[in-house]
Amino acid sequence: MTLTTPLAGSRPPYRSASESLAVAPGSRRRYLRAASVLAIFGAAAFFIDLPVAEWCKAGRVPKDLLRLLNLSEVFAHSAGATCILVTALFLDRGLRFPSFRWPAARWPSFQPSAAQERMARMICTTAAGGLAVDLIKLLVDRIRPRAADLGSQASALGTFGDAALAAASASHSDYNSFPSGHAAVATGLAAALTWRYPRGALLFGAFAASASLQRVATSAHYPSDICLGAALALAGAAIFLGDIAPDEAAKA
């Protein structure tokens, strides 16, 4: 049995051409290039993971800045992202709750209407990176900075596995530093919102960056974790937003 992925802009037979989203060749490549750049930054960040983590763990982040970063976490939390998408659904007449019936559940372009396809693409883009991160966390253990004996590590690679664990007992979450799910959700949400509302690109990007930095400032993640989590989110955007035209998406 061969599974095929519908092309961006393809539509089910009961949708007219006027109800289809326009195609903008090259958009997918831009998402993939951005994801590649973040992955490279993530690899390079291994060289600064330990000093940055030690600095944050020592409580040197200014309290006012930390308070601001903590407020931005809502943009990266699954519950917060859900609330934001629900708000967009209620306020934007160009969005409708997607159908989960077959064949609509097969792929966003099989949704009964363009408005439902838009919402389905936004939901999938927001969730894709986070789901990929959860899968990696099942396979790779990395001790979070808050639970690691950072001073005894020769390099950031020592934080993988359980050798860097500072205490004899730790929660399951303490082993799940790599990569950052919060950064993945925040970046995926920012990509989805930017696709639908291009004028807010800088604002959404700033929210995603703040939410990701909050994870480093609170000793929940290393810099490499957030870079690679964001890279996975943009790879998800390449899959679910692909070459759909942002300008067309912004029209209700």
What is the meaning of each model-derived region?
Residues 48, 90-91, 96, 128, ...:
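Hydrophobic membrane-targeting signal helices
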Residues 54, 104-195, 199-200, 208:
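Membrane-interface loops
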